[in-house]
Amino acid sequence: MNKYITLSLLGLAALASHAQDFDSKPTLELGNKEQDVKFTIGARMMTDAAYYHSDFTPMHSGAALTDARIRTSMTYRNWYFYADFGFGKGKFDQKNIFLQYAVKDKHEGNHAVKVGYYTDPAGSMARLTSLGSYHFISRAGAANALGTGRELGATYKYTNKHVTAYQGVFAENQYNKVDAGINGVSVAGRWVVRPISTADQTLHFGLNMRYAHLGGGETYNNVLKKSLSLGQSLETYVDENQDFSSCTLDWANNTFDVGAEALYHNKRFFVRGEYRHKLVTKKRDSKTLFEASNDNIDTWGTLSAWEAANPLRTNHFNGGYVETGFLIFGSPYHYDTNEAVLGGLKGKALEVVARYNYTGLNDINKGEYFSAGRNQYYPDGYMADYPYNSSSVGGGNVNSFTVGLNYSFNKYAQVMLNYTLHKVDKDFLPYDKTIHALQARVLFSF
């Protein structure tokens, strides 16, 4: 069998439709030509160092092994299996693992059906781009706070030179581990058109949408109570504190996400951006909760009075970013048509990049007063002893400005340097207005 097995540095042309799962084409391949089977293995390591300066709330400067992973794939004719496992920060973390069947039609269109655990199509353009191919140390905060990551599901994707249509259905928890209730379910899609699509430049416009019925939760006074948490770190992995921009939404029931994106690149310049809006609806069994509240001396008397004192409303959040880069020298920027994302640096290269990001997790009723000492909003506009509960959400708004310099030694090794200025607006942290972050990364991938 040895004459059929090779271990070599190959271009992997036969895997061209699958190589997007790796940051670069895998170096190691085992192949059995007789059985038409190919097996690849790759790895990635990221080590970050960061210095932070904040107005009041401390952040932990230092260094961390932020990512370490092993990646494997197997191809048999039109079948493709991929598995990716992480060991960063000293813990095991399952990444992508899926099976895909793909065929090409007579019009050069690609049809692919995928089943497994991987990034939601509507997760955002940033989340669909591998971090090893990203042009910044972290994805934009809005993509992390309002986008969606990996889920267990099944999708169908159609791609040709000018169009990508990617849609599917997903389960909320990949292991069906819920304390109460049932697993959540979502349907999502991303649709991209490319008016310009050549080897040297690409212009694309995209739309994505996602509807999710949330699952899980806890039993509270004999009522199922579901919650949704949203948040982001300050675009860093050394200290992933989300206190500056995060919220937990009790009684969350459904979410609806919509996003728009645009991307342009030529040989030495790129610009891309996204806008995202998230709507969260609420639901609860008010009658049962009201009856449970009557078991003590303090009661609201009627259901309508209790509902007025405990208001429930739909929340809206939004955010977006714009990123740009200029290649000083190196191989031209390139576009991955199958994934509809910008590729990473290839070979020896030097680039400068810049980004503006806005994340809005404040949804505050006009005229309400906030007590930082009690971490509480007061609907009447002043502090009271027995106030109604507020439906305001003060998760925090963040404006972030980043500049960076990236140098790639070769197709395997790269160093990155980012400086970010964050402007924070969160009622619970009134003394934190400006945060500075200086970060560096060493990246190795094969």
Predicted stretch roles:
Residues N2-S8:
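Sec-dependent signal peptide recognition
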Residues M125-S130, I137, G215-Q242:
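Acidic/polar loop-and-plug regions of large Gram-negative outer-membrane beta-barrel proteins
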